[in-house]
Amino acid sequence: FFTQEVVDAMIYAGDHHLDVVNMSFFADPWLFNCKNDADQRAIVTAISRASRYAQQRGVVMVAAQGNEAIDLAHPVTDEISPDFPPGSELTREVGNNCVVLPNELPGVVGVTGIGPSGELSFFSSYGAGVTDVTAPSGSSGQAPNPFGRVLAAWSSTGPPIDLPGRDVQDAGGAVYAWVQGTSMASPHAAGVAALIRAAHPSMSAGAVQATLQNTAMPKDCPTPAETDPLSGALGVQTCTGGPGHTNFYGKGLVDALAAGSG
């Protein structure tokens, strides 16, 4: 989704006082928007204002961390954008003046993904100060298919879909498919936030976020803290943080029972 569509959707959410919004996307065309670039700085400003507008009207904003296996607290390169027009991708250096939208915006709940083994999914991005909670996203290397993936709704309307390695039914209407990605994780967290809102309709957006995090099941860093899930293909991922909060898992795994009954 490009800037105008993202801004319009956030303003709509605020105007209609939606309870929870899930955002399983990054704002096209840039994975990282860098504030030293005038055009990208304008994108950051516009989407930040729209997000703040929605939050001020009680909307709980939840976002996927992304599937690039990047430490968002220490980004180095962006190799996948701009993603439009197709084929225009370039490799560029990025730093902490560059952010992924919308998940690095203030007040947005950032969600990483874990696989069936309970470990960080091999593709999940993460980062200190960015990761708030974690949720199931699938991770095909941790269990045989289809159990290494998540059964999720999938629209098959529009042009034919060809996704290597994914079981997608090419038929009219909505179907289900075994997929993986932090796009599967953030809806779990958004669903738990919705349970909190249902149990406490007058609770503020900030209080819902706090409850979501404080009722999560804590997850410590793995031993060893450095992992190399794809033997160098994605680089080494290093878990940092102490008991109760890490850059891999934030406050921990979302807990629907604890959150809904709290």
Regions found by a protein language model. Give the residues of each.
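Flexible, glycine-rich phosphate/dinucleotide-binding loops
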Residues: W30, I70, S117-L120, P159, ...
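Internal, charge-rich low-complexity segments
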Residues: A69-F84, S140-L151, T157-P160, P218-D228
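Outer-envelope exported proteins of Gram-negative bacteria
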Residues: A64, T134, Q209-Q213
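Extracellular S/T/G-rich loop segment that most often corresponds to the catalytic His/Ser-adjacent loop
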Residues: V59, G87-A198, N247, V254-A258
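Short amphipathic alpha-helical segments
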Residues: A46, P187-G191, A207, T211
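Flexible loop residues that form catalytic
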Residues: F26-P29, G113-P116, A216
